[in-house]
């Protein structure tokens, strides 16, 4: 899909667009079993779209068909007329809340010196500008292939005719060996401790897996699907060449925590999920290669070089040392701005440190990264809570700008009867207290340590947080741990890898069950969960089928402890509202790419990003917003506006 990415960037000043909603390629790649094709406007000689337009907004221009946007009224007549289904009508926001609908199609990158970007960037050279003579030749070649009974190269069958003109990338794809996974500790071994379960790649493994990358263009689809737009094919090429220092330096241009994201990112939903090889021999193991180069380089003493950075004299207060705050601080310090990071916890990382269990993320990595950030010039004020130990008024008075990356710490409730009873725990306090226990830190009254050894534990929920709770309880030595989820396994929001790991470690799963009430014993302590069985009904607004209770299907599952993992809401920050920062109906901070300066709030000196803005989401989306907000802060300090790509 390098052609799609190239097309979008060619129409956006060679920059990635800032939101998925703006990713509107004028060429579409279709992948289906036995078929791969790119579809776009054919610039027909007697174009039906031209004839259908009631306002003369589409016209022949030489050998191409062009849309005159100033005349387009968004009527969709061209969409109906196009026999190839390649016309779109897109809606773009205008001033004062207005929108404009206009036709959107391939324009052959009119005015672009190098010609169509899709042709230039296709790694397999499968796209070309064709005249009549070329089309006749291609038709002859197709007829010849049909006569020879050839199949597509990626189907790995041996054709009856030779393929002297097959592209190098197609041959490379056909010869690519299967994906290799990192070694993993045996389930019985890993259940006995909280150490990371995945072993790092050896240099040989890293080389073998890097060699599988097809290098799909300068800006590949894996780069686009990564919220940070990491230069993935480029640093994989450097790994192939054995240049780890250059690879890690390149990865740090877009990501200040590559050793973290390599471990905890859901690559299967992002970069690896988009990999061209995914459906053939398995996606390139991007996350493990990222982890390898970071671990190798940092262990050997590599550090970011900021020797050429000149201090600007500006200072920015950052509230929250989680992914958003750290990414913001990293970008600011690289531009000569002094970031001072305030956090209520004794270590940086936010939920990276205290929410993600140590068996997924070794906590020593955050301590090392704090030392690196400090060497770069970032100052940390830990065990310091805004609104308690320091006021927002002080920050606004003493700093040139403030960034809020406070995350989301308030657990969602299901509204079940007896959910406040003894033995019922919210997921996040349970995980935070456990991590503090592992790190040798004292528990707090708000987050008391809970040991589930010998207990029958039921975890309600189906996301990664639920899996973290399940696997933590198993490591405590719980007698039995069951995860109960209201939909089927295919609809679980959590990572398939995490579900697989939990099963290997002994977790039980109960699908299509909806909790009705929490049962109590004579002492008022939880002793079970009453469920109704469900079946999947009509889709909800998000397209997922709703679980519908089955009448008369009630049953009680015994439980000594119940952990509720339904997700998180933004927690209340009265000091934020007092400063004049507008919130939405769900308590999230109103800020985004459409702000005057990226991620500026209703209070001009305050910027925000991450989960406090978008709700609970991924580490990389929080980091991406932290970086966007840093750009907004830099522009605000310089009083200039960055184009809204």
Feature annotation, model-predicted:
Residues 469, 612-637:
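A conserved FAD-binding loop/helix module that cradles the flavin
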Residues 246, 310, 315-319, 367-416, ...:
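Feature captures the FAD/FMN-dependent oxidoreductase FAD-binding
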Residues 420-454, 539-616:
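FAD-site-proximal beta/loop scaffold in flavoenzymes
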Residues 176-183, 187-199, 229-241, 251-252, ...:
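Beta1-alpha1 glycine-rich phosphate/pyrophosphate-binding loop at the start
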Residues 235, 259-263, 269-319, 335, ...:
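FAD-binding core/adjacent interface of flavoenzyme oxidoreductases
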Residues 1-11, 33-56, 66-85, 100-121, ...:
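Cysteine-centered iron-sulfur cluster-binding motifs in ferredoxin-type domains/subunits
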Residues 320-323, 462-463, 611:
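Glycine-rich Rossmann-fold phosphate-binding loop(s) that bind the pyrophosphate
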């Amino acid at each position: 899909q390098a052609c799609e990415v190239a097309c979008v960037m060619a129409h956006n000043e060679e920059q990635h667009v800032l939101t998925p909603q703006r990713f509107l390629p004028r060429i579409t790649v279709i992948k289906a079993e036995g078929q791969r094709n790119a579809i776009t406007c054919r610039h027909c000689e007697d174009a039906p779209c031209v004839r259908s337009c009631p306002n003369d907004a589409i016209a022949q221009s030489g050998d191409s068909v062009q849309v005159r946007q100033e005349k387009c009224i968004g009527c969709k007549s061209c969409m109906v007329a196009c026999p190839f289904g390649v016309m779109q009508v897109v809606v773009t926001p205008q001033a004062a809340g207005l929108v404009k609908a206009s036709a959107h199609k391939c324009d052959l990158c009119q005015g672009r010196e190098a010609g169509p970007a899709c042709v230039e960037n296709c790694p397999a050279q499968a796209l070309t500008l064709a005249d009549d003579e070329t089309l006749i030749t291609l038709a002859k070649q197709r007829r010849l292939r049909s006569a020879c009974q050839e199949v597509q190269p990626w189907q790995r069958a041996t054709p009856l005719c030779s393929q002297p003109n097959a592209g190098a990338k197609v041959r490379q794809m056909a010869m690519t060996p299967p994906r290799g996974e990192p070694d993993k500790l045996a389930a019985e071994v890993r259940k006995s401790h909280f150490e990371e379960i995945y072993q790092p790649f050896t240099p040989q493994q890293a080389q073998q897996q890097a060699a599988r990358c097809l290098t799909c263009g300068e800006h590949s689809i894996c780069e686009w699907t990564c919220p940070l737009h990491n230069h993935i094919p480029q640093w994989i090429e450097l790994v192939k060449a054995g240049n780890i220092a250059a690879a890690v330096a390149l990865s740090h241009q877009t990501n200040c925590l590559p050793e973290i994201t390599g471990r905890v990112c859901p690559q299967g939903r992002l970069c690896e999920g988009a990999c061209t090889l995914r459906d053939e021999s398995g996606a390139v193991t991007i996350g493990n290669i990222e982890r390898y180069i970071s671990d190798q380089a940092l262990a050997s003493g590599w550090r970011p070089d900021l020797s050429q950075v000149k201090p600007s004299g500006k200072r920015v207060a950052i509230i929250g040392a989680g992914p958003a705050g750290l990414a913001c601080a990293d970008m600011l310090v690289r531009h000569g701005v002094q970031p001072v990071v305030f956090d209520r916890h004794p270590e940086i990382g936010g939920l990276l440190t205290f929410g993600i269990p140590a068996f997924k993320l070794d906590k020593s990595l955050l301590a090392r990264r704090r030392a690196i950030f400090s060497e770069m010039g970032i100052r940390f004020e830990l065990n310091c809570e805004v609104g308690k130990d320091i006021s927002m008024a002080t920050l606004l008075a003493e700093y040139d700008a403030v960034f809020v990356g406070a995350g989301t710490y308030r657990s969602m409730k299901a509204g079940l009867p007896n959910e406040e009873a003894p033995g019922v725990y919210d997921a996040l306090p349970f995980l935070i207290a456990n991590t503090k226990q592992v790190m040798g830190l004292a528990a707090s009254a708000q987050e008391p340590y809970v040991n589930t050894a010998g207990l029958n534990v039921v975890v309600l929920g189906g996301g990664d947080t639920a899996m973290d709770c399940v696997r933590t309880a198993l490591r405590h030595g719980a007698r039995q741990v069951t995860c109960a989820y209201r939909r089927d396994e295919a609809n679980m929001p959590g990572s398939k890898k995490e579900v697989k790991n939990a099963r290997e470690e002994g977790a039980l799963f109960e699908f299509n069950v909806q909790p009705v009430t929490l049962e109590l014993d004579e002492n008022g302590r939880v002793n079970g969960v009453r469920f109704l069985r469900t079946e999947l009904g009509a889709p909800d607004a998000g397209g997922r089928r709703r679980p519908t209770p089955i009448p008369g299907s009630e049953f009680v599952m015994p439980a000594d402890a119940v952990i509720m993992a339904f997700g998180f809401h933004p927690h209340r920050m009265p000091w934020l509202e007092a400063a004049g920062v507008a919130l939405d109906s769900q308590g999230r901070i109103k800020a985004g790419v459409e702000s005057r300066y990226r991620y500026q709030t209703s209070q001009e000196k305050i910027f925000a990003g991450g989960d406090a803005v978008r709700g609970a989401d991924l580490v990389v989306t929080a980091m991406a917003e932290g970086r966007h907000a840093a750009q907004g802060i830099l522009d605000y300090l310089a009083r200039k506006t960055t184009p809204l790509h």
